[in-house]
């Protein structure tokens, strides 16, 4: 009986898959690039179970090896309230998967000699020079101390500026309680208002001493705007998105794009509490480089393949191979406290490069992979990783803003490596 029930659920799940859309990369049979077709079918089974259990509305998964797409499927529903089937060209709120793209934008300016890593942040926005460091005393009070050294542009890329996010379960210090959540400043004001707001807060740590996940890449986006004299979205469109053929990437979905926005369940399947992705229905007043972009999974796998190729895709070069190599090296030296695994438990054995997490060790992590793997994810349910040793890029989109998103990241990576036979 259980087999019959599962077969029926799988059939219903398969019926919700979208008709074929244009593939974002050349395609190959799994066996041609070292995958097992039956192994990759476990991805279908996994999402069939999750959708049948109403733990996630739907997903889009893209897997490429050797530059060839071997798995590109849509599962379940785009909008669980309306019952709309999930299309391959669904548009996802990327949240922090915006950060690697903003980092690439900054590195294009570095290559032009316009934004060196060792530049002082205060050279672009002087108010950062006056920020103090909040040191928590034994009685819980904050003592404000001067910066031991200035915040550098380098600190923004690797999250060692001392800036943080509020509203995160891994950031519950007295300093964190003073900070807004990741998207609030972009909803409430423009770039200048964001800078004025953030520079009135204390830093969580002395610059260059500890990895602290937060607004660093948002500030980098503001610096990019200052240097380029363009909005971040305009600069990304001209220098990253359009050259790579990322046709739906944007900070402001158009009226034509909005019907393709992936939406979550109204209530968190784990807690039963109301949940929402505010950016789906709220126009931001600034292009926040840390959290506010949208794209399809097909768009983002082209971005990932560009990085895996050393900065080029289909004849369009975005960065030099040497710059990509520098970006994807670990920039957390022994003098810096590495708290990357605090953001996500499965990131033991990871350091951090310029806008991406970088695996530095065999073992340690809860998920398979190789040293040199680069990745980052989004709080609304998106996932991205590249494994240069395996010539592999994987991008996943779900609308799952609760804690379930972390479960999917681990399970998907387990399934992908389990399907690799060569």
Question: What do these predicted regions represent?
Answer:
Residues 26, 123-126, 131-371:
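Short, surface-exposed loop or secondary-structure junction motifs
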Residues 7-19:
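Bacterial N-terminal signal peptides
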């Amino acid at each position: 009986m259980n087999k019959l029930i599962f077969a029926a659920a799988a059939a219903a799940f398969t019926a919700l898959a979208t008709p074929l859309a244009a593939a974002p990369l050349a395609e190959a049979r799994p066996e041609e690039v070292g995958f097992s077709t039956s192994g990759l079918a476990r991805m279908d089974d996994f999402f069939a179970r999750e959708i049948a259990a109403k733990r996630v509305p739907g997903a889009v998964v893209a897997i490429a090896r050797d530059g060839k797409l071997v798995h590109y499927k849509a599962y379940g529903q785009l909008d669980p309230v309306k019952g709309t089937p999930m299309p391959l060209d669904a548009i996802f709120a990327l949240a922090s998967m915006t950060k690697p793209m903003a980092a690439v934008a900054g590195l294009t300016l570095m290559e032009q000699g316009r934004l060196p890593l060792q530049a002082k942040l205060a050279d672009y926005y002087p108010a950062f020079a006056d920020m103090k460091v909040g040191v928590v005393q034994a009685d819980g009070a904050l003592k404000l101390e001067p910066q031991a050294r200035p915040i550098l542009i380098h600190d923004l890329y690797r999250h060692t500026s001392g800036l943080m996010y509020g509203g995160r379960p891994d950031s519950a210090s007295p300093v964190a309680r003073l900070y807004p959540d990741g998207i609030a400043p972009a909803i409430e004001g423009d770039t200048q208002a964001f800078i004025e707001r953030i520079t009135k807060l204390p830093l969580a740590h002395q610059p260059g001493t500890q990895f602290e996940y937060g607004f660093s890449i948002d500030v980098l986006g503001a610096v990019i705007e200052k240097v380029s004299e363009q909005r971040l979205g305009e600069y990304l469109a001209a220098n990253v998105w359009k050259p790579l053929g990322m046709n739906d990437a944007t900070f402001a979905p158009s009226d034509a794009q909005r019907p393709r926005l992936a939406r979550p369940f109204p209530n968190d399947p784990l807690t039963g509490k109301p949940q929402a992705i505010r950016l789906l229905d709220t126009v931001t007043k600034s292009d926040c480089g840390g959290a506010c972009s949208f794209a399809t999974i097909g768009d983002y796998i082209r971005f990932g393949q560009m990085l895996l190729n050393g900065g080029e895709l289909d004849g369009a070069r975005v960065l030099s191979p040497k710059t990509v190599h520098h970006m994807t090296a670990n920039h957390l030296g022994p003098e810096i406290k590495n708290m990357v695994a605090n953001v996500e438990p499965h990131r033991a054995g990871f350091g951090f490069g310029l806008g991406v997490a970088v695996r530095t060790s065999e073992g340690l992590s809860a998920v398979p992979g190789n040293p040199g793997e680069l990745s980052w994810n989004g709080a609304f349910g998106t996932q991205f990783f590249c494994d240069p040793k395996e010539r592999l890029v994987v991008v996943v989109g779900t609308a799952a803003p609760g804690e379930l998103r972390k479960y999917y990241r681990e399970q998907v990576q387990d399934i992908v490596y389990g399907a690799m036979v060569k």
